[in-house]
Amino acid sequence: MRWNTVLFDLDGTVTDPKEGITCAVAYALRQQGIIADPDTLTSFIGPPLHESFPELFGLTEEQTDRAVEDFRVYFSRQGWAENIPYKGMAELLESLQGAGLKLVIATSKPEEFALRIMEHFGLAAYFHRICGAQREDLSLIHI
């Protein structure tokens, strides 16, 4: 059987999200007077923010809600642009597309940010669809 579609995640597959996520977390924590060791902030990559802030820094529910909001403020301003495409990704995508495959992004990142990131790095044109979380879903996932 020949496959005709290749499904990609965004963070950790197409782009390295470390800089944008860790800087956004550091910003959110600073808003609450917490200065964190940068090495601990990589633990925020992957799990939902609403779990990571209380687990790693002991934030209350109210503090966590505020930290998540501050994270989103930073991320929407500049954190999204701090993603870095992995070396060779454009060439890989071009090759797959040239082989007649449909390429799709499926991410828990809000779709507006996924689109912005892919367009910023000139990668959006390789994809048939870029699918992410919708705005109303944001309380359930991390960015």
Describe the predicted segments one by one.
Residues 13, 110, 136-138:
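Glycine-/small-residue-rich active-site loops that bind phosphorylated ligands and cofactors
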Residues 29, 118, 122:
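Conserved hydrophobic residues forming the short capping helix/wall of the S-adenosyl-L-methionine
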Residues 141-143:
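Conserved small/polar residues in nucleotide/adenosyl-binding loops
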Residues 25, 89-118, 131-133:
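Substrate-recognition element of Asp-dependent hydrolases with the DxDx(T/V) motif
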Residues 71, 131-137:
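Short, acidic/turn-prone active-site loops that include or flank metal/cofactor-
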